[in-house]
Design a protein with these regions (language model features):
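Bacterial carbohydrate/catabolite-sensing allosteric modules
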Residues: 1-61, 69-140
Length: 140
């Protein structure tokens, strides 16, 4: 039987810089360590195709804000990487660490780096204006 590259669904928004950067990194990894076959549907956070349950892939990399979408991905029982998703919100009986991981940014480290930079410039009065319901923003 001929080699079949892994099939990986990329459920990542393509309309924002962060999503495009993630896609660029995944593509680079695939070039170095692959090849992988990708399933990518351009769009925003709620972009999983309705037939996702019937897709027979080998893994998923997802940035979703939708609880139902996250649970659907877990029900597929394939390795899943969640980007900045609060996995604490997932039902314990569905979430299994051996096949699911949550990749988050170091928000505290980013905040410290920004503060140190501003302090190094002699600024002592500054503030952060973030997004109220974004996990990464709240931590900063």
């Amino acid at each position: 039987m001929a080699f079949q590259p892994p099939r990986v669904a990329l459920l990542i928004e393509t309309s924002r810089s962060y999503g495009r950067s993630v896609l660029h990194g995944v593509a680079r990894y695939s070039r170095l360590h692959g090849p992988w076959n990708f399933l990518l549907t351009p769009g925003d956070f709620a972009q999983a195709p309705p037939q996702m349950r019937d897709w027979h892939g080998d893994g998923v990399i997802a940035r979703t804000l939708d609880q139902q979408m996250a649970e659907t991905l877990l029900e597929m029982e394939i390795p899943t990487v969640f980007l900045d998703y609060p996995v604490d919100n997932l039902p314990r009986q569905k979430y299994r660490k051996e096949r699911c991981v949550d990749l988050t940014s170091d928000s505290v480290g980013a905040a410290q780096m920004a503060a140190n930079y501003l302090l190094g410039k002699g600024l002592t009065r500054f503030a952060y204006a973030g997004y109220p319901f974004q996990r990464w923003s709240i931590s900063r």
